[in-house]
Design a protein with these regions (language model features):
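Conserved class I S-adenosyl-L-methionine
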Residues: 37-46
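Short, glycine-/aromatic-enriched active-site segment of Class I SAM-dependent methyltransferases
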Residues: 139-158
């Protein structure tokens, strides 16, 4: 079982694939989408859950998603057909950092995908290229809510605390106009869903050759979360506008 398969199984019960509950997602989209007929782009869209929810809430909205994963985009297409949204959704299989479109977008989303661009500020610079005048970016990334252990830093990378994270964004030429800091409940719910969905699949498929590896991956992830980074990791979503166009 490869990394992508594990991620698919782990997010089966939490398709937004970030530590946010449904109300938080809805509020962020309401704040980020300027009007019903807007164009929305998701860079690193995975299964397209952000776009599907935006399309369902805004009947005139048009959306595009970019992801490297063929299987994730297939899930997005299938879900769009089931919901009757396929006519307003365009999906592109390519590296999101290299994506080019013939038009600009009113909202660019990239939540939990900054690693694909080389970090938060690099993600924002990529998003800036796609923004229409007056457009907004909805970005989500991790931060340290308290001093991390060396093991946590090794595991999750060179994050900053929340004030420093926001200061860096502002220094990069962006102004926050809204945001959401994931609650401890949202963070815990996400991790329980991740580990629980993967473990349940393994237990439900004992004869599958990947079952034991999937169960081991769930156990390892749960241990790392509870023992290494649970008390230090936070997640923030920011809605940003360019400070100057």
């Amino acid at each position: 079982v490869n990394r992508e398969q594990i991620s698919t199984l782990a997010h089966a019960d939490h398709p937004i694939a970030a530590p946010l509950d449904d109300d938080s997602v809805r509020r962020l989209l309401e704040r980020g989408i300027p009007r019903d007929g807007a164009r929305v782009l998701d860079l690193g869209c995975g299964g397209g859950e952000w776009l599907l929810r935006a399309l369902a809430a805004h009947p005139q909205l048009r959306a595009e998603g970019v992801d490297i994963s063929e299987s994730a985009l297939a899930r997005a297409r299938s879900a769009a057909r089931t919901l009757g949204l396929q006519e307003r959704l365009v999906l592109h299989q390519e590296d999101a950092a290299d994506f080019a479109a013939p038009h600009l977008f009113d909202l660019v989303i990239s939540v939990g995908a900054t690693h694909a661009f080389g970090g938060l500020l690099a993600t924002l610079e990529t998003a800036r290229k796609h923004l229409a005048p007056g457009g907004r970016v909805l970005v989500g990334d991790g931060f340290w809510s308290q001093e991390p252990s060396p093991d946590a830093v090794e595991m999750l990378g060179d994050l900053a605390d929340l004030p420093t994270t926001v200061d860096r964004v502002i220094s990069g030429g962006w102004t926050p106009v809204h945001g959401h800091i994931s609650t401890s409940r949202e963070l815990d719910d996400y991790e329980w869903a991740w580990t629980g969905s993967l473990a349940s699949w393994a237990l439900d498929h004992p004869d599958d050759p990947d079952s034991s590896q999937a169960l081991a991956a769930a156990t390892t992830h749960r241990t790392e979360w509870l023992s290494v980074y649970r008390d230090a990791f936070g997640f923030v979503c920011l809605i940003l506008r360019p400070t100057s166009d």
